[in-house]
Amino acid sequence: VQGKTVYQDGFAPVEVQRVFARIRRICGAETEITVDTLQGHFWNYDRNQRPPDPAWAKSIWSDFRDFSLYALKICAQVPTDKQVKALQAALPDCDIRCFSGEENWHKITKSTATKANALAPICAACGLTIDRITAFGDDFADLEMLRLAGTGVAMGNGVPAVQAAADITIGPNDTDAIAAYLHTQDR
């Protein structure tokens, strides 16, 4: 808000290494991992192959051996349900969720790093009450935020649970649906 960070909850470097160790122990030493930091997106993809999606072309390659940055989010390829359950048991302080549409990629965040937890500090910084907030979402990580906000808006391509929890569903997030919705609210 006004150029200042209002809420941030991630992994200190020592915690990042703990998460890496658990991933490698459970899923194997060669498991693909990505890390989002304030400095960029890091990935240990096979350097003999290009990243599969041009959107990831700016990823910074790392083997993560000496990785010492604060991480906002860690993602890993976790191929089996058994490995997912083992990872959840090994990291009880983390939220581990499969990306919708990406069956083997799982997002790992601190369990306290939620969009819903960010609403109160944002409201306080802006001098608003939560009932004045309109929140937009399309995936499972958005559910609690949509329920807390004064108006929860699901994207048309969102998962069914998000659409069911929202007050309204608009067009998909690859269109101008949010802008169109906000324009109708501006009157």
What is each stretch, according to the model?
Residues V1-Q2, W105-K107, V162:
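A short acidic, helix-capping loop that chelates divalent metal ions and anchors anionic groups
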Residues V14, T114, N173:
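Conserved active-site and cofactor/substrate-binding residues in soluble primary-metabolism enzymes
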Residues K4-Y7, Q49-P51, T114-K115, T184-R187:
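Short, surface-exposed amphipathic charged segments that create phosphate/polyanion-binding patches used
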Residues V1-Q17, I23:
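Glycine/small-residue-rich loop that forms an oxyanion/phosphate-binding "nest" at active or ligand-binding sites
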Residues R18, R22-F136, F140-M145, N157:
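Conserved acidic, metal-coordinating active-site core of Asp-based
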Residues L148, V153-R187:
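Asp-based, Mg2+/Mn2+-dependent phosphohydrolase catalytic module
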